[in-house]
Swiss-Prot record:
Native source species: Burkholderia cenocepacia (strain HI2424)
Designated name of the protein: Glutamate 5-kinase
Principal subcellular localization: cytoplasm
Pathway the protein contributes to: Amino-acid biosynthesis; L-proline biosynthesis; L-glutamate 5-semialdehyde from L-glutamate: step 1/2
Residues bound to ATP: 14, 173-174
Length: 372
C-alpha cells in the first residue's frame, strides 16, 4: 500500500499538544525543530504546507506553573495568551534556520461562519502559500467562547483543508493510528491501515477521550477526516513519534491510518454551509422525507417534519434528523422554529392558511441543503 501523501501537493499538517510540549513539560524545542526540518524537506519537493499547531494553552500552563488544565474559560484564555507568544517565537526561529518565513494566523469559528471573512481568510492563506510562506494556524483561544469554539484543532485542521482545497490532511498524534479496538484494553486490536473516511463503523472504533493536555481524542480525528472529505481531501492519522514521519509519508511509505475521501467534492458554497455555519436547532423528519432528501435530491417540505427542537430564526442552519436519531442533512431554513411548529405535518398548500402568509413552499430548498 502506497501513502496517499506521495501524490499530494497541498498539505495541511496538524501537530498535537503532546508532540510540541513533550507531554506538558514546556515547549519541546528539539521536536519543533524536527517538524520544521521535515516541512522544509517537503517544501523542497514542491509541496505546499500549512501547519496547524496546538500547544499554546499547554505552554501557557507550564509558564504559569499550572499542572492541571483549568476549566474556567478566562483561565484557559489567559494561558493561551501567555503560551502563544512562546509558540510563535520557537516556530519562527526553527523555520528561519531553513530559510523559510512563517506567518501566524489565529482563527475562530465566527471568522469562518461569516462568508466575507471566510473568503478573506482563504485569500490570505493562498497568498501566503504563493509567497512561499508557511502559515502556522491555531484557534484564537484568547477570545473564543463556548459558542464559537471549533472544539479541537483536529476539526480546525479539517476546516483549513477545506478552506484552501488541500489535497490531504495529516493528523500527527501520540498514537499509531486508528485501531479496531482500544489496544490498551484489547490485545487483539489491530491497526486500520486504510478505510473510507465516511465509513460509519470508524466512529464506533474511535470512541474515547483524548489526553488532559489537548481536547481531541481519536473520535475527533475520525470526524475531522469526514469533514476534510467534503472538499476531496484524504486524511492520514499517524504517530508524531515516528522518525521523519512526514518525509517518509511523502516518499510513499504507508504509516498509520489512511482515510480516503470517496465522496463527491461539494460545491464551494455548500461546503461552507456544511462546515462553518453553526446549527441552531433541528427537525425530526419521517422516513419518507429521509428517502427524498438522500436518494431523490428533493427539498424538505413541512409535511415531512415530525418534530421541531431548538430555537432558530429564518435563514439559520438547522439539522435534519431521521426517525433513528441520525443526522442526514442540514440547511438554511425558510421558517423560524415558531413558524415550523405551526406548519409541520401540513402540506405546503396549507401554509398560508395557518400562518396568514407563505414565504416559500419548502422548509429547506434543495439548493440550500447539504447531505451529511
Amino acid at each position: 500500500m502506497r501513502s496517499i501523501i506521495a501524490d499530494s501537493k497541498r498539505l495541511v499538517v496538524k501537530v498535537g499538544s503532546s508532540l510540541v510540549t513533550n507531554d506538558g513539560k514546556g515547549l519541546d524545542h528539539a521536536a519543533i525543530g524536527r517538524w520544521a526540518a521535515q516541512i522544509a524537506a517537503l517544501r523542497a519537493q514542491g509541496k505546499e504546507v500549512v501547519l496547524v499547531s496546538s500547544g499554546a494553552i499547554a505552554e501557557g500552563m507550564q509558564r504559569l506553573g499550572w499542572s492541571k488544565r483549568p476549566r474556567e474559560i478566562d483561565e484557559l484564555q489567559a494561558a493561551a495568551a501567555v503560551g502563544q507568544m512562546g509558540l510563535a517565537q520557537v516556530y519562527e526561529s526553527r523555520f528561519t534556520e531553513h530559510g523559510i518565513r512563517t506567518a501566524q494566523i489565529l482563527l475562530t469559528h465566527a471568522d469562518l461562519a461569516d462568508r466575507e471573512r471566510y473568503l478573506n481568510a482563504r485569500s490570505t492563506l493562498l497568498t501566503l502559500l504563493r509567497l512561499g510562506v508557511v502559515p502556522i494556524i491555531n484557534e484564537n483561544d484568547t477570545v473564543v467562547t463556548d459558542e464559537i469554539k471549533f472544539g479541537d484543532n483536529d476539526t480546525l485542521g479539517a476546516l483549513v483543508a477545506n478552506l484552501i482545497e488541500g489535497d490531504a490532511l495529516i493528523i500527527l498524534t501520540d498514537q499509531s493510528g486508528l485501531f479496531t479496538a482500544d489496544p490498551r484494553k484489547d490485545p487483539n486490536a489491530t491497526l486500520v491501515g486504510e478505510a473510507n473516511a465516511g465509513a460509519p463503523e470508524l466512529e464506533a472504533m474511535a470512541g474515547g477521550a483524548g489526553s488532559s493536555l489537548g481536547r481531541g481524542g481519536m473520535l475527533t480525528k475520525i470526524l475531522a477526516a469526514k469533514r476534510a472529505a467534503h472538499s476531496g481531501a484524504n486524511t492520514v492519522i499517524a504517530s508524531g513519534r515516528e522518525a521523519d514521519v512526514l518525509v517518509r509519508l511523502a516518499a510513499g511509505e504507508a504509516i498509520g491510518t489512511q482515510l480516503i475521501a470517496r465522496t463527491a467534492r461539494m460545491a464551494a458554497r455548500k461546503q461552507w454551509m456544511a462546515d462553518h455555519l453553526q446549527v441552531r436547532g433541528h427537525v425530526v423528519i419521517d422516513a419518507g422525507a429521509v428517502e427524498k432528501l438522500t436518494a431523490g435530491g428533493k427539498s424538505l417540505l413541512p409535511i415531512g417534519v415530525i418534530d421541531v427542537q431548538g430555537a432558530f430564526a429564518r435563514g439559520e442552519v438547522i439539522a435534519c434528523v431521521g426517525p433513528d436519531g441520525r443526522e442526514v442533512a442540514r440547511g438554511l431554513t425558510n421558517y423560524s422554529s415558531a413558524e415550523t411548529k405551526l406548519i409541520h405535518r401540513k402540506p405546503s398548500g396549507e401554509i398560508e392558511t395557518v400562518l396568514g402568509y407563505m414565504l416559500e413552499p419548502e422548509l429547506i430548498h434543495r439548493d440550500n441543503l447539504v447531505l451529511v
